[in-house]
Amino acid sequence: MVTKKEFLEDLTNATNEMIKAGDKNGDNQLSKKELYELFKKCKYPNPTLVTNSLLELFDLDKDGKLSVNEVKTALLVDYIIEAETCLKKFVDSIFKADSNKDNKITWDEARQFFVTSGSNEAQAKVFANSMFEDVDSDDDKCITREELREYAIEYYEIYPTE
């Protein structure tokens, strides 16, 4: 997954390029007319539809203009939703190890999960030790959903809650 920083940099650059290409009055925004002219110049099949769709999606203050911040804000919401969905799937997949369904994974549950997943006993112990070393942030010998979520955010460099 792309980091939030990379996502915002790419998005900002692309939006700035689009605004630069179509901004006729130099206000660093694209009016409805400027958007229409830009898409007409690029030979979009239906520039009116594209213009109206973009304004509907991204013109958050409904002033009839698009700014870089409006596009970033609108898309960041989608990014956060996707990141949260991926995090939930990741945590849920690991929490299959929680055999007694108490919302905590013990070392024994982790070891057994790795055995059930095809590891031999020695490998399962190594994997369980590694998992607890990396994820059990409060050293209470249990892994919670929140610890696993925080680990995933750091490990995969995604920051959906910032």
Swiss-Prot record:
One of its GO terms (molecular function) is calcium ion binding. It holds the Pfam family EF-hand_5. Ca(2+) 2 binds at residues 59, 61, 63, 65, 70. One of its GO terms (cellular component) is nucleolus. Gene3D superfamilies: EF-hand. PROSITE patterns: EF_HAND_1 (PS00018), EF_HAND_2 (PS50222). Disulfide bonds: none annotated. SUPFAM superfamilies: EF-hand (SSF47473). Residues 10-45, 46-81, 85-120, 123-158 form the EF-hand domain. The keyword Metal-binding applies. The keyword Hydrolase does not apply. Interacts with numA/nucleomorphin in the presence of Ca(2+). This is Calcium-binding protein 4a. It comes from Dictyostelium discoideum.
